[in-house]
Curated annotation (Swiss-Prot):
The polymerase/reverse transcriptase (RT) and ribonuclease H (RH) domains are structured in five subdomains: finger, palm, thumb, connection and RNase H. Within the palm subdomain, the 'primer grip' region is thought to be involved in the positioning of the primer terminus for accommodating the incoming nucleotide. The RH domain stabilizes the association of RT with primer-template. It comes from the Viruses. Encodes for at least two polypeptides: protease (PR) and reverse transcriptase (RT). The protease processes the polyprotein in cis. Reverse transcriptase is multifunctional enzyme that converts the viral RNA genome into dsDNA in viral cytoplasmic capsids. This enzyme displays a DNA polymerase activity that can copy either DNA or RNA templates, and a ribonuclease H (RNase H) activity that cleaves the RNA strand of RNA-DNA heteroduplexes in a partially processive 3'- to 5'-endonucleasic mode. Residues 215-445 form the Reverse transcriptase domain. The keyword Hydrolase applies. Its EC number is 3.4.23.-, 2.7.7.49. InterPro entries: DNA/RNA_pol_sf, Pept_A3A, Peptidase_aspartic_dom_sf, Rev_trsase/Diguanyl_cyclase, RT_dom, RT_RNaseH, Viral_Replic_Matur_Polypro. It catalyses: DNA(n) + a 2'-deoxyribonucleoside 5'-triphosphate = DNA(n+1) + diphosphate. This is Enzymatic polyprotein. One of its GO terms (molecular function) is RNA-directed DNA polymerase activity. It comes from Figwort mosaic virus (strain DxS). The lineage of its organism: Viruses, Riboviria, Pararnavirae, Artverviricota, Revtraviricetes. One of its GO terms (biological process) is proteolysis. Belongs to the caulimoviridae enzymatic polyprotein family. The active site is at residue 54.
Length: 666
C-alpha cells in the first residue's frame, strides 16, 4: 500500500530490489508510512524508534545498532537478497520473538532480520498479515491485536537513531539521555546516490570498520605499532622523583582493577626506573557517567624537565573552512590514541609512576605528557596525508566530509583502508557513519550551520557565581573563550574579570563580581546557529570600534541575495592603541577583523562594510614613510595583500558590529 518497497516477494528466501524502488528509501515523504515504536531490553533504558511500514517487503528488517548483540543469532538458513545490479547479498542474522510497542500496545514479531539499510526498523508484509486487517488513512494506520483495532498515528518527520554507540548510551548505568536522531530527509534523492545503502558496498564499509576496531589500542592482531616516540630530558643526568601520594581504601581498590587491566593489555610493565611520578584517580563528569574513576599520573615535573615537541595542532577555524559546502559526514575516534604510540626503552623509564600496587612504567605514550598531542598529530597527518581533500584529523578525532553519498562511500572506504594499512585502531562505539548532522571537536555541524554542543553551554552554567581563586576564574574565562565565535562582544564582557588575573592584582572577590558572573550566564541562554559559508557565497565583513574595543561580523551572501551571519569576533585595544585617533582605531578594527577571519578571506574577493568614511581615502592616499606615518604605511601594505571592495555603512545601520563594541552594562 506504499509507493516504495525494500524487498519484493519472490521465491522463498529470495527478494529483489530495482533502482526505482530505491528512490524513496530512507526518505520522509507523504507516500511513505512511518510510525513510532518503543523497544525495551533488559539492562537498557526504553527508547523510541521510527519504523517504516512497507507491505511490499516480505521480511521485517532492523539495524544491528538498535537490538543488543546478544539477541542476534545465526539464521538457520541464509536469506539471499538480489539487489539492483543482480548481485546477491546474504542476510545471516535473526532476532526471534521481538516485542515492540505501538500506541502503547505490545506486538510480538516472530523474526526480525539484520541488515543495514539506512532505516532503523522496517515492518514488512509478514507483520501486516499477522496483525491483519491492516488499514491506513491519511494520517494514521491500524493493526488488529487480539481482535482489537489499534490506531497508530503516522510520523511526518522521521528520524534514524542507529549508530555504533547508540546502545552503549542507552544502557541503564549510562547517564546519557536518548540522543535525537538524524532526520530522514524528504528530498528525493537520485537512485544511484542511494545505491550503496543496501548493496554490498555498505556492507564492505561495516566489515572494514570491524577490521580496524578493537578495545585494545595495541591489539596484537590489528595494530602494526608503527607509531614510535622518544622523550628526552633537557639535562640527561637529571633524576625526577616526586613524593608518592597517600590513598583511601576505595582508591586502592580502584587502582587494583585499573593496574591489572593495563598489565593485561600490555600497556604498562613493572619498573626499576630511578624516576617516579605519583598517580591518582579523578572523577570528572565523563567518569561519573561511566561510573568509574580514571587513573591519571601527575607528570608536571617530567614535563618541566623534558624537551617539548613543536608540531602545531590544526586551527579550529581553518578546519571549519574545509567543511564549506559539504553535506554528508562520518567521524571516527582513535581508541585511546596516545596509547597507540610505542616509546623506546629509555623514554619508558621517564614515564615511571607510583601507585598503591607499586612502581610501573608505560610502554606507550601516556596521557599527561606535554609532547603527546603533537606526537600523535604528526603521526596521524603522515598517515592520512593523501586523503586531506576529504578528511581532516585533530589529534585522535577524524572527520570525513563529502558533497554526495556516492563520493562519501569512496572517501570513507579510502580512509578506512589507510587506517587498516597503518594498523591504527578505532573505537567502534564512537564511529558515526553517513550523517547529515555530526558532532566534531565540541561543535554540532548540521546542514551548513555550526554551533557549540550543548555541554559547552552547560559547562558555563555549572560554574558557581562566586569563583574561588584565579585558577577558577581562568577556567571560567577559558570556556567563554572557546565559544567566542558565537558570543557577540565577548571582549568587553570578559574585560572586568580579566583584570583580576593580573600578577600585581591581589585576589578579591566581591558580591558585585558574583552578580556580574550571574549576569553573564543569564545572557547566555543559548548559542546561535551560525552559517558555514559555501565556496560560491560572497563574503562580507562589518566592523566597528569604540574607545576601548573593536568588533566585527563575518556574513555570507548566497546567490538568492540573503545574507547570513557566519562568525562574530571582538577584542580590546592595547593600552597604546587606546591613545590612537578615532580614525586610526576604525582602521585597526578592520585590520583585526580581517586577521580573525583570514581563513575565509584568502584568496577570495570580499566586501568590507564600515561606518568610517575615511577608509577608502586611506587606501588610495600616497603616504610618506616618515616616523609620523610609519604605522599607517605598514597598514596600507598589509591591506594590499587582500582583495576587497569597500561599502560605507551609516552608523545607525551598523547594528551587528556596533553591538559588539557597545557597553555591556548599558
Amino acid at each position: 500500500m506504499t509507493s516504495s518497497s525494500l524487498f519484493r516477494e519472490g521465491e522463498l528466501g529470495h527478494f529483489c530490489l530495482n533502482k526505482q524502488e530505491m528512490l524513496h528509501l530512507n526518505v520522509t515523504n507523504p507516500n511513505s508510512i512511518y510510525i513510532e515504536g518503543k523497544l525495551s531490553f533488559e539492562g537498557y533504558k526504553s527508547f523510541n524508534i521510527h519504523c517504516y511500514v512497507d507491505t511490499g517487503a516480505s521480511l521485517c528488517i532492523a539495524s544491528r545498532y538498535i537490538i543488543p548483540e546478544e539477541l542476534w543469532e545465526n539464521s538457520p538458513k541464509d536469506i539471499q537478497v538480489k539487489i539492483a545490479n543482480q548481485e546477491l547479498i546474504k542476510i545471516t542474522k535473526v532476532c526471534k520473538n521481538l516485542k515492540v510497542k505501538f500506541a502503547g500496545k505490545s506486538f510480538e514479531i516472530p523474526t526480525v532480520y539484520q541488515q543495514e539499510t539506512g532505516i532503523d526498523f522496517l515492518i514488512g508484509n509478514n507483520f501486516c498479515r499477522l496483525y491483519n486487517p491492516f488499514i491506513q488513512w491519511e494520517d494514521r494506520i491500524a493493526f488488529h491485536l487480539k481482535n482489537e483495532m489499534v490506531l497508530i498515528k503516522k510520523v511526518t518527520k522521521a528520524f534514524s537513531v542507529s549508530n555504533p554507540s547508540f546502545l552503549e548510551n542507552m544502557k541503564k548505568d549510562s547517564k546519557t539521555e536518548q540522543i535525537p536522531g538524524t532526520n530522514i530527509s524528504k528530498n528525493i534523492i537520485n537512485p544511484e546516490e542511494r545505491y550503496f545503502l543496501i548493496t554490498e558496498k555498505y556492507q564492505k564499509i561495516e566489515q572494514l570498520l570491524d577490521k580496524v576496531c578493537s578495545e585494545n589500542p595495541i591489539d596484537p592482531i590489528k595494530s602494526k605499532q608503527w607509531m614510535k616516540a622518544s622523550i628526552k630530558l633537557i639535562d640527561p643526568l637529571k633524576v625526577i622523583r616526586v613524593k608518592p601520594m597517600s590513598y583511601s581504601p576505595q582508591d586502592r581498590e580502584g587502582f587494583a582493577k585499573q593496574i591489572k587491566e593495563l598489565l593485561d593489555l600490555g600497556l604498562i610493565i613493572p619498573s626499576k626506573s630511578q624516576h617516579m611520578s605519583p598517580a591518582f584517580l579523578v572523577e570528572n563528569e565523563a567518569e561519573r557517567r561511566r561510573g568509574k574513576k580514571r587513573m591519571v599520573v601527575n607528570y608536571k615535573a617530567i614535563n618541566q624537565a623534558t624537551i617539548g615537541d613543536s608540531h602545531n595542532l590544526p586551527n579550529m577555524q581553518e578546519l571549519l573552512t574545509l567543511l564549506r559546502g559539504k553535506s554528508i559526514f562520518s567521524s571516527f575516534d582513535c581508541k585511546s590514541g596516545f596509547w597507540q604510540v610505542v616509546l623506546d626503552e629509555e623514554s619508558q623509564k621517564l614515564t615511571a609512576f607510583t601507585c598503591p600496587q607499586g612502581h610501573f612504567q608505560w610502554k606507550v605514550v601516556p596521557f599527561g605528557l606535554k609532547q603527546a598531542p603533537s606526537i600523535f598529530q604528526r603521526h596521524m597527518q603522515t598517515a592520512l596525508n593523501g586523503a586531506d581533500k576529504f578528511c581532516m584529523v585533530y589529534v585522535d578525532d577524524i572527520i570525513v566530509f563529502s558533497n554526495s553519498e556516492l563520493d562519501h562511500y569512496n572517501h570513507v572506504y579510502a580512509v578506512l583502508k589507510i587506517v587498516e594499512k597503518y594498523g591504527i585502531i578505532l573505537s567502534k562505539k564512537k564511529a558515526n557513519l553517513f550523517k547529515e548532522k555530526i558532532n566534531f571537536l565540541g561543535l554540532e555541524i548540521d546542514k551548513g550551520t555550526h554551533c557549540p554542543q550543548n555541554h559547552i553551554l552547560e559547562n558555563i552554567h555549572k560554574f558557581p557565581d562566586r569563583l574561588e581563586d584565579k585558577k577558577h576564574l581562568q577556567r571560567f574565562l577559558g570556556v567563554l573563550t572557546y565559544a567566542e565565535t558565537y558570543i557577540p562582544k565577548l571582549a568587553e564582557i570578559r574585560k572586568p574579570l580579566q583584570v583580576k588575573l593580573k600578577k600585581d592584582v591581589t585576589w578579591n572577590w566581591t558580591q558585585s563580581d558574583s552578580d556580574y558572573v550571574k549576569k553573564i550566564k543569564k545572557n547566555l541562554g543559548s548559542f546561535p546557529k551560525l552559517y558555514l559559508p559555501k565556496p560560491e557565497d560572497h563574503l562580507i565583513i562589518e566592523t566597528d570600534a569604540s574607545d576601548s574595543f573593536w568588533g566585527g561580523v563575518l556574513k555570507a551572501r548566497a546567490l538568492d541575495g540573503v545574507e547570513l551571519i557566519c562568525r562574530y569576533s571582538s577584542g580590546s585595544f592595547k593600552q597604546a592603541e587606546k591613545n590612537y585617533h578615532s580614525n586610526d582605531k576604525e582602521l585597526l578594527a578592520v585590520k583585526q577583523v580581517i586577521t580573525k577571519f583570514s581563513a575565509y578571506l584568502t584568496p577570495v574577493r570580499f566586501t568590507v562594510r564600515t561606518d568610517n568614511k575615511n577608509f577608502t581615502y586611506f587606501l588610495r592616499i600616497n603616504l610618506k614613510g616618515d616616523s609620523k606615518q610609519g604605522r599607517l604605511v605598514r597598514w596600507q601594505n598589509w591591506f594590499s595583500k587582500y582583495q576587497f571592495d569597500v561599502e560605507h555603512l551609516e552608523g545607525v545601520k551598523n547594528v551587528l558590529a556596533d553591538c559588539l563594541t557597545r557597553d555591556f552594562n548599558a
